[in-house]
Amino acid sequence: MAFCNKLSGILRQGVSQSSNGPVTSMLGSLRYMSSKLFVGGLSWGTDDSSLKQAFTSFGEVTEATVIADRETGRSRGFGFVSFSCEDSANNAIKEMDGKELNGRQIRVNLATERSSAPRSSFGGGGGYGGGGGGGY
């Protein structure tokens, strides 16, 4: 994370010499992503509250969310935990990655931003013969 701090300092120097818009939002994204964790391997019984409780000993948890299937409402087995500072997030990774939570071994690492490729709600995507298919 020292890299992020150094990058932040370099970018701030550039900000003082140019407009704040894009660089400021980029700094915010870097800071946000460096304190947001992906938590995989969650049991079906883990909810937002129990996920947050499992991570509060490492620092102030600003958000804890278990991702659910849109149609069934059932947990998809992963979630995200956000901390107010990146040191807390780093400590949580060190201490919780590979540990057991609600009977399942979990994986904990820094969250990465989703790719910006648009997602189609009409299926598609290949299969035999290529062409994608699906949709209207």
UniProtKB/Swiss-Prot annotation:
Induction: Up-regulated by cold stress and down-regulated by salt stress and dehydration stress. SMART domains: RRM (SM00360). Residues 35-113 form the RRM domain. Residues 1-33 form a transit peptide. The modification Phosphoserine is found at S43. Keywords: Mitochondrion, Phosphoprotein, RNA-binding, Secreted, Transit peptide. InterPro entries: Nucleotide-bd_a/b_plait_sf, RBD_domain_sf, RRM2_NsCP33-like, RRM_dom, SLIRP/GR-RBP-like. Residues 122-136 have a biased composition (Gly residues). Its main location: mitochondrion. One of its GO terms (biological process) is regulation of defense response to virus. SUPFAM superfamilies: RNA-binding domain, RBD (SSF54928). GO terms for cellular component: cytosol; extracellular space; mitochondrion. Binds to small phloem-mobile single-stranded RNAs (ss-sRNA, e.g. small interfering RNA (siRNA) and microRNA (miRNA)) in the phloeme exudate, including viral-derived sRNA (vsiRNA). Possibly has a role in RNA transcription or processing during stress. Binds sequence non-specifically to RNAs and DNAs. Mediates cell-to-cell trafficking of RNA interference (RNAi) signals (small RNAs (sRNA), e.g. small interfering RNA (siRNA) and microRNA (miRNA)) which regulate growth and development, as well as responses to environmental inputs, including pathogen attack; can compromise zucchini yellow mosaic virus (ZYMV) and tobacco rattle virus (TRV) infections at the early stage. This is Glycine-rich RNA-binding protein 4, mitochondrial. It comes from Arabidopsis thaliana. The lineage of its organism: Eukaryota, Viridiplantae, Streptophyta, Embryophyta, Tracheophyta.
